[in-house]
Amino acid sequence: NGAQNEFILVVNFDGLNTKTHGGTSFITHAATGGDMNPNLIGINGGWQGITVTKEFVDKFDASARNGNNEPTAWKDKRAMFHTGGQTYENTNIKEFKTAGYAVTKFRNISSTGAVGKDPAKDFPDTDLPLIRLAEVYLTYAEAVLRGGAGGDRATALGYINQLRTRAYGSAAGNIADADLTLDFILDERARE
């Protein structure tokens, strides 16, 4: 989605040379389970351990809902959820196979569609971003809103709308100055 172009500081992972069950191995495998196809994530199977609450899902603008008014598609490209066979409301944290939507943001598939180098698909080549340009933009905007010196609201709004233009693929998700609040910045951090 272009977000990888914003990486400033990353922990590099290589499926052949940095084998660990932590890092992005954990993120990709633990978020895969239920009726998900692990091949679509570029791994050999899931650990069935991570889903999100509906409150997190609701931070994204839905573009489609099912008969129960549960979101199934989103305008924001950052909303990467597996919904098939999953419930919208995660009321049982012990039940991954059906409780809550799974997040599919981290995959062992490159931006060109290539699967990682580990032939067994145990260990991903997916790098873990520690600092991204998006974080810098969000920090700038938060500092301005908290009264920090040296910044201005118009620049902060411009930075936030750059993130949203990337996320929506157009200016359709951009916000107005009146929408730029600390609560909005907190929600935007979650979406990023």
Per-region residue spans from a language model:
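Elongated scaffold/linker segments in the mid-to-C-terminal portions of large proteins
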Residues: N1-Y137, R146
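Generic detection of long, well-ordered alpha-helical segments
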Residues: G46-W47, K54-V57, R153, I175, ...
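Extended amphipathic alpha-helical segments enriched in small hydrophobics
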Residues: D125-R166, S170
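Conserved catalytic neighborhood of penicillin-recognizing serine enzymes
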Residues: I160-R191
